Amino acid sequence: MTELIKKGSAAKEAAQFLAQASTKQKNAALLNLSNDLLTHTASLLEENNKDIIRAREKGTPETMIDRLRLTEERIKEISEAVKQVVALKDPIGEVTNMWKNEAELTIGKTRVPLGVIGIIYESRPNVTVDASVLCFKTGNAVILRGGSDAIDSNKALMSVIQDSLEASGFPRSSVQLIEDTSRETARDMMRLNRFLDVLIPRGGAKLIQTVLENATVPVIETGTGNCHIYVDKAAEKQMAIDILVNAKCSRPSVCNAAETLLIHRDVADAFLPEIETALKEYNVELRADERAREILKDSKAATESDWEDEFLDFILAIKVVDSVDEAINHINKYGTKHSEAIISNDYATGQAFHQKVDAAAVYINASTRFTDGFAMGFGAEIGISTQKLHARGPMGLTELTSTKYIIFGDGQIRN
């Protein structure tokens, strides 16, 4: 708890400094950080390799090791992502609305930082940089708590970040890492109301549920991605195959990857054999319901948990449905309100799907893999929010701000 209190107090002070920093000052510091990450590539890879070796010794699946791995190319991508954040418009100070009331007061609404943000996350060390940069750009101090499996990578990245920001004239406590990765410290952080203004968990269902059950700090939930592809009877076969392969196989370990295929009974016989052939190239394990197994002889029988799980692996659950309404009901029962897709050339069916499915992002004839700040065209994001309060969907710079009212008067008093 001592580490949390010390770093929480320092973060509060840093937040006051950051709130006054100009966009020019923040961008200059971020450009320096982008260069410093490249300069320290060798040492970052050396520390990351310690995490990789430890993960292999524990028998961690390769798909999860991929989330943990840094490479020279990935560090270049991280560095470039920092530059992309520099290019984004700074929302701080933006006046979103202004009007006069009956008392002739001029009332303005402007964007301000949230304050001190806490982020608890798991294996991906790139989150250490992404989260730091986004919070910094929006004038927020941030306290990060990564997983034990990436601790050496995170400590190395944090050292580069803090040294770089300090060299640019900012407090080292603008961005901090909790190095104690114990569950007890994580739970203490969830109750750090005295210092944290908001807590954002990024990770699997178990982590997010733990935060929701234990946190007294306000939480923005970045949900897991049990994403579905529904292939309608009016779907174009090759389009359906291409989208499914991309959504499942391009990067199965991320939250916007597809986990379940729902397919209309009228096209199941014609589509499923070709879908199976396409997925075999990636060694995807198929877990199918009874009707789908009659067509897919090499598939395994799906269990109830298969409809609920976020596999994050080359595994796909498959179910044959009688109608779009059955598909919608299945998604609303088992989905995590993240990203859902329909493949159909019938306009009315597509409209019904997007109106009835409860999710942050609903796709018509496109892959779920586009649920990402850069892919959607508004820049880097801190995570994908699956809740409805404060933010929903990819959380970019604007979602890391609050608002303040500024009222200009000329001596008015209220009668």
Swiss-Prot record:
Keywords: Amino-acid biosynthesis, Cytoplasm, NADP, Oxidoreductase, Proline biosynthesis. Pathway: Amino-acid biosynthesis; L-proline biosynthesis; L-glutamate 5-semialdehyde from L-glutamate: step 2/2. Gene3D superfamilies: Aldehyde Dehydrogenase, Chain A, domain 1 (3.40.605.10), Aldehyde Dehydrogenase, Chain A, domain 2 (3.40.309.10). Catalyzes the NADPH-dependent reduction of L-glutamate 5-phosphate into L-glutamate 5-semialdehyde and phosphate. The product spontaneously undergoes cyclization to form 1-pyrroline-5-carboxylate. It comes from Listeria monocytogenes serovar 1/2a (strain ATCC BAA-679 / EGD-e). GO terms for molecular function: glutamate-5-semialdehyde dehydrogenase activity; NADP binding. It is found in: Cytoplasm. Its EC number is 1.2.1.41. This is Gamma-glutamyl phosphate reductase. The lineage of its organism: Bacteria, Bacillati, Bacillota, Bacilli, Bacillales. GO terms for biological process: L-proline biosynthetic process. It comes from the Bacteria. It is an enzyme of class 1 (oxidoreductase). Belongs to the gamma-glutamyl phosphate reductase family. It catalyses: L-glutamate 5-semialdehyde + phosphate + NADP(+) = L-glutamyl 5-phosphate + NADPH + H(+). InterPro entries: Ald_DH/histidinol_DH, Ald_DH_C, Ald_DH_N, Aldehyde_DH_dom, G-glutamylP_reductase_CS, Glu-5-SA_DH, GPR_dom. One of its GO terms (cellular component) is cytoplasm.
